[in-house]
Structures are given as structure tokens and as C-alpha cells.
């Protein structure tokens, strides 16, 4: 359960840097660990920054203008990979019950929570939950792909590391089950595409999800280092500010210097919850129920 006294607000970058220094002194953040938060970024001063720091978790949320887009950002460092979890409605794969992200966050006492992939709404990709393979469909999709390999899938292992299975890669069910066992995969997310892999920017002409060539509200999650993560949305927060194609969003993630990054469901689904409150502006100014 989070410590209420560990939450705080900051109104300038210096205050956040002091919190980061405290996390370094406690050895939660390594002395040489490069942080995404940057005091030289074009921070939106009118919006408070929120942070959390205890002996096992650091998180900070802020908003900045990057390449003329308003980005809502969250950087997280945890001491143990088990602190990063996937929450399904009723903790049951396939549950028909839907809830708001704020409700799911409250059920798990989450410091930070984000929406992922609306897994019950689509049949594409590979779904793993609690080390068990639930979805691997070999039916033909568009005549070129199978449903399981029609998109990129993000798989997260017990060490908290990101692993990818890519669109078009041919695998059998047995291959995937062996991969899950060999890499101790805890769960997967099936949306995508991969935005950054091993520090390399990824760009696309076509992808079956996310209307990638349209200006759209975007959301993505990244791994920066060991148990070090970053989440960002680009939303319709100001009528004068454009949103992103997927290639533009990938470029924004790449500018942050992350190791791996993966697109999550955007639009009204793209949501960042900190300490029980929605931090970014959601499309239509209303949460969407998810599974």
C-alpha cells in the first residue's frame, strides 16, 4: 500500500531534481542512471508536477511541449520487477466486466496506472497472463498474416524486461509456449507497433491498428533501463496543438533516449492515472471503461 506521506507536488524542476537526488542517495536510482526528466525541457509551468518516493518506488509526472506537441509524461523506477503488474478486470482473463482505469488503479493501490490494449476487443496478437498463453490464433488475417502475428506483441518477463514478437514472424503454439517458459514471461500487451527497439527508431508505412497515418491521440510505454520505465501520451489538450501519426510519436519517444518503446491503445483509451487521479486530458474528457 502506498504511503500517503510519500506523495508530493512540485512547481519547478529544481524540486523534482531534489527528489531524484534523494532517490539516488537511497540507492533506488543508480548514481550513473540517466533519467528522462530534464530540467531543460519545455515544461508546462501552469501544471503541477506530481511525484512519489519511498524506499522501493520513485515516480514523477509532468507535462511538456516537445516538437509542438503537449506530452504528458511519467517516469518510474522500482526496486523489484514484481511492482510492475498487469491488472485485468476481476483479475480474470476474459471477464466481461469493464471498469474505468481509475477504478482498476484503486483496486490495486497503484501509484501509477495506464491503460494498455483493450485485449477483449480484438483477436490480433499473442496474449499471455500469469505465465499462461491464452490467445494464439492461426486464422488467416488479410491473406498475408495469421492473427497471432498480424501485430507486434510486447512480452514482459519476471525481471521486468521488455521482449518483442514482431509482425510477420512465423511461430507455432509450441514455440511460443517454450519462449514463455524459457524467458519466464509474466504477461503480454497486444497493440503496438514497436516504436523503439534497442535504441533504434522504428518507422511504418502500414499497421493494422491505431490508424497510424492519422493525427491521433497517442500513448506508449518504454523501458529505459533495469526496472526503469517511461510512459507518455500526446493528447488533444489544446485546440492549437496537433496530435501525432504513429511515426511522429515514435520520433518523440526516440528523442527521450529510451531503450525499448511500444505503442498502447490511444484515443480515448490513452490514460495516465497518478495517485487515483487522471493526469492527462482524455479525448472527450471522459474515461472509457476497459477490461
Label for each model-derived stretch:
Residues 1-291:
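Gly/Ser/Thr/Pro-rich low-complexity, intrinsically disordered segments
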Amino acid at each position: 500500500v502506498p504511503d500517503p506521506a510519500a506523495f508530493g507536488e512540485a512547481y519547478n524542476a529544481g524540486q523534482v531534481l531534489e527528489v531524484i537526488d534523494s532517490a539516488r542517495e537511497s540507492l533506488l536510482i543508480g548514481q550513473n542512471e540517466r533519467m528522462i526528466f530534464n530540467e531543460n525541457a519545455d515544461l508546462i509551468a501552469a501544471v503541477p508536477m506530481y511525484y512519489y518516493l519511498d524506499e522501493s518506488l520513485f515516480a514523477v509526472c509532468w507535462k511538456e511541449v516537445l516538437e509542438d506537441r503537449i506530452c504528458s509524461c511519467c517516469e518510474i523506477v522500482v526496486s523489484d520487477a514484481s511492482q510492475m503488474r498487469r491488472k485485468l478486470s476481476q483479475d480474470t482473463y476474459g471477464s466481461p466486466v469493464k471498469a474505468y482505469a481509475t477504478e482498476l488503479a484503486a483496486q490495486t493501490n497503484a501509484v501509477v496506472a495506464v491503460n494498455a490494449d483493450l485485449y477483449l476487443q480484438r483477436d490480433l496478437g499473442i496474449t499471455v497472463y500469469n505465465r499462461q498463453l491464452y490467445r494464439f490464433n492461426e486464422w488467416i488475417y488479410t491473406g498475408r498474416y495469421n492473427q497471432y502475428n498480424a501485430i507486434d506483441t510486447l512480452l514482459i518477463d519476471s525481471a521486468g524486461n521488455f521482449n518483442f514478437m514482431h509482425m510477420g514472424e512465423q511461430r507455432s503454439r509450441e514455440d511460443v509456449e517454450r519462449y514463455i517458459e524459457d524467458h519466464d514471461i509474466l504477461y503480454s500487451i497486444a497493440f503496438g507497433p514497436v516504436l523503439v527497439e534497442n535504441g533504434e527508431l522504428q518507422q511504418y508505412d502500414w499497421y493494422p491498428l491505431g490508424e497510424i497515418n492519422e493525427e491521433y491521440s497517442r500513448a506508449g510505454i518504454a523501458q529505459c533501463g533495469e526496472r526503469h520505465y517511461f510512459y507518455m501520451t500526446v493528447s488533444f489538450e489544446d485546440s492549437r496543438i496537433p496530435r501525432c501519426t504513429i511515426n511522429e510519436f515514435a520520433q518523440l519517444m526516440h528523442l527521450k533516449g529510451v531503450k525499448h518503446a511500444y505503442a498502447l491503445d490511444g484515443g480515448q483509451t490513452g490514460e495516465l492515472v497518478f495517485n487515483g487521479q487522471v493526469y492527462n486530458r482524455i479525448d472527450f474528457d471522459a474515461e472509457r471503461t476497459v477490461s
